[in-house]
Amino acid sequence: MKQTIRVQIREPGVILAGEIVYGQRRAWGNLSYRPLKLSLMRPRPSSGAAQNVPLIVWLCGGAFTEVDRDIWLPEMVWFAKKGYAIAGVDYSTTYRTRFPESAEDVKLAIRFLKAHAAEYGIDGNRIVLMGESAGGYITALCGLTGKNREFDTGGFENYTSEVQAVIPWYPLVRLSGMKIEPDRVTLPHDITAYADITGYVTRDAPPFLILHGSGDSLVPLSQGELLYDSLQKAGAYADMIVLEGAEHADTAFVQPEVKALILDFIEKKLP
């Protein structure tokens, strides 16, 4: 059967650039270097369309011991089709380095992306930082310290790591003594030195949207509520969405209605 159809373009195509090196860390007895990489997904440019799109920087979790920048990217296609670029960022883990190098890496990635905004077709003044679990902790910490230089190392220091909105999913907030994964990983001392990120909360914090499941048996709902309450008390803008019955890293977090709520927050808060 032969058909001729007329197709109405309702959403953009999506393209992916993987293996982008944004920095490096010393390795093997400080005698060699290992690359720090990100993957960048964005709407495919079309004739007459705006080229510089807003950016979501995404951080996956992994108990501070492992990270995979691409593992959640299939779920992020939804946002790319709504007109956003998404950068999945690898960061240092505690098996290789000491904290706060993971936060330093993420802030370096943000500055790198700002420095290369024209090249990648992104708007360096419209950046959202979003992450889950351990990545949610780093998301909140980096979002709260964007206006100071505490963790700014590695290059591109003529740019700041400031972002315009912060969206941590089921984040760790007060870490001291917590087990990340039952019977397997306990937070090392160098992380617990930064045990309570509410100490970084100020009135000038960027807008926050916190997502947490009421049934989270790994990172209790009280952790997300602690961050929300701290932001509210400081006079900063904060929203919180509690997913009834949702566990840690639950599939509920990637359902269309939840993504739509995230998008609504982003569209209201980006300049």
Residue locations for each model-derived region?
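Short beta-strand/loop motif that positions the catalytic acidic residue
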Residues: I210-H212, D216
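Mobile cap/lid helix-loop segments that gate and shape the active-site cleft of serine hydrolases
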Residues: V7-P12, R25, V163-Y200, P206
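Short beta-strand element of the alpha/beta-hydrolase
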Residues: A50-G62
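N-terminal cap/lid segment of alpha/beta-hydrolase-fold proteins
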Residues: M1-A50
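Short amphipathic alpha-helix adjacent to the substrate-entry channel of hydrolases
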Residues: R69-G88
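The conserved beta1-alpha1 loop
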Residues: L59-G61, L113, H212
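Primarily recognizes the serine-hydrolase "nucleophile elbow" in alpha/beta-hydrolase
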Residues: L108-I180
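C-terminal catalytic histidine-bearing segment of alpha/beta-hydrolase fold enzymes
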Residues: L221, E225-P271
